[in-house]
Regions:
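Topogenic membrane-insertion module of multi-pass membrane proteins
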Residues: 1-51
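Short hydrophobic "helix-edge" motifs at membrane interfaces and signal-peptide entry regions
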Residues: 10-11, 54, 60-62, 84-85, ...
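Alpha-helical transmembrane segments of multi-pass integral membrane proteins
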Residues: 21, 51-52, 59, 98-102
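Membrane-embedded alpha-helical segments that form the functional core of polytopic membrane enzymes
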Residues: 30-31, 41-67, 125-136
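Membrane-water interface at transmembrane helix exits
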Residues: 33, 37, 41, 67, ...
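Aspartate-rich (DDxxD/NDxxD/DxxxD) Mg2+/diphosphate-binding motifs
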Residues: 63-106, 146
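Intramembrane alpha-helical segments
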Residues: 90-151
Length: 151
């Protein structure tokens, strides 16, 4: 079966890089946390769950973008690689485009995390900053977690 022809820089390429199936890793913890919050005496605040969901989804998407671009730069993604197409390795998007998109997603994650910091204080600041750093450290930096059995 032949793949349909797609125009250069199509939304389909960005959707492929986004890897929607991985978003369950961001959604499930927020849904579980929201369910736990719903039975607490303080009650559940939908807007907190909404900001948490947006922030975690953008962190996951940024991780996917960085992984795609950095694995290509390091030579980890080759034509022999099994699994879904990696847009950078396939030449559908440049590593620079995908890295910029990852950075933009981190900015969005930060913006959506600010209201959580206002409510949750210093613990949320620490969790947020570590999450933002680990997004890149998964496949970037001098000791990428993905190459050490940690990802």
């Amino acid at each position: 079966m032949n793949e349909p022809v797609v125009k250069q820089h199509s939304m389909k390429f960005w959707l492929m890089a986004l890897r929607p199936k991985t978003l369950t890793a961001a959604v499930v913890p927020v849904v579980v946390g929201s369910a736990v919050a719903a039975v607490q005496p303080e009650g559940w605040h939908p807007w907190i769950s909404g900001f948490a969901l947006l922030s975690t989804c953008f962190i996951q998407i940024a991780t996917n973008f960085f992984n795609d671009a950095l694995d290509f730069k390091k030579g980890a993604d080759t034509a022999e690689r099994l699994g879904p197409t990696r847009v950078t390795q396939a030449g559908l998007l440049t590593s620079r485009q995908v890295m910029w998109a990852g950075g933009f997603c981190l900015l969005l994650a930060f913006i959506f995390g600010v209201p959580l910091v206002v409510v949750g204080g210093l613990p949320i600041v620490v969790i947020g900053l570590v999450s933002l750093a680990m997004t890149y450290a998964y496949t970037g930096g001098p000791y990428p977690m993905a190459y050490r059995g940690l990802g």
